[in-house]
């Protein structure tokens, strides 16, 4: 039923905008511009006296002298609708029209039905191929020692995108498939990446032959250029090595023009087909073999240095007959000032620093398989947050000095996030022990609790800034794919989940350091304790859901 739709910031802002303009009954017609009538507050300071604000500049634009008519004020105050937060109070102040949510009702609505807030707001259909050029065979299979940090960044972004899009309902495949038990596959496993593999003896020769014939017979083959270029004997031998008895040249510029594609490099001209390109095209063809062309999108996740080459490959695939929508996710470089470092060295450095930090805190306890697993996950978390927390088109600069170390206390990065997630595990372990000992009763159903007991400003901040908007954040990659223009590049905000988790961890840590959740086992204190436990249980599930999109399992201690 529409009334049971989870609360949504977007739905609330749209409804408020409609009410302020006097067209609340026509929410579907409200443009994105109208959403700017209202601002959702997020700082603790502003949330003390309002949750949404329509500034005076907006009011004076809409109404003479900024005087809001009484019927409009009434419409805002009595606002209802699918996904709309319950309105508690409205007031015209010197800053504008402020709106306060009925917080008790909001806590009850969210905490008594948390599951919709932990998954994307909508489920979609379609197929997405995520292609990672850094992993394609050139002379030999890539290895951790030959993998540059910029290439590692593209792999982590590809992995994160795949996890997000699968949760949004898409069927996702990855390209290329890698040889089983190869060094690169084992390295990716240490980072929590389950990349598709094939037997070592597997070949893709049939599909390479298919791609070769498709290009030889392509309408975009530039035979005039081929005729004008005689090959030496050495070039003929090299061509035979490439599987091509004669040069095959494709007019990529014509492909771009005929397909009316935007955003491609204007210097794309005529390209000679290399064996490496045939292998790449064969992998793309194999990965999309079971996908219907009409609903398939290919995302090429590549570094800025390799963008031109990948544009060439994309247009060769198109010239060979592929009809999938192709977009490029371009990633900025990774810089390590004063140091040359490959992916394997970087991972080993962070692992050594993580082990050292753990030994300083826990001493001789840090040994055995359990601790090996914890250190591996924490290292993976550190690497992922360092390489994913920046907008993917921007450069990342890493501090890779051996003595810089890592800390669980500093409010940044994967270690801090995992530490605060582990604190929630410890809290609920302590509560469950208290239940076993008879100190506390089981948490009753949310409908039996009085959520007006949640008066701490940090409690509302955690609900309003994190629990309610989370599903909308998970939904944004698919929204961008669906609605952004059809240029070659697409920007998918792959940094959002990491930044969201770091911000959440700062606010949760501040709250948890101030508030004693498990109080004295006195009946008159139980209602507030149970309300807080429900809030923090929802936060724990949020952590797990967000970390799952990064392929990071939560850990019980740190």
Curated annotation (Swiss-Prot):
GO terms for biological process: arginyl-tRNA aminoacylation; tRNA C3-cytosine methylation. One of its GO terms (molecular function) is ATP binding. Residues 213-240 are annotated as: Disordered. InterPro entries: DALR_anticod-bd, DALRD3, tRNAsynth_Ia_anticodon-bd. This is DALR anticodon-binding domain-containing protein 3. The gene is dalrd3.
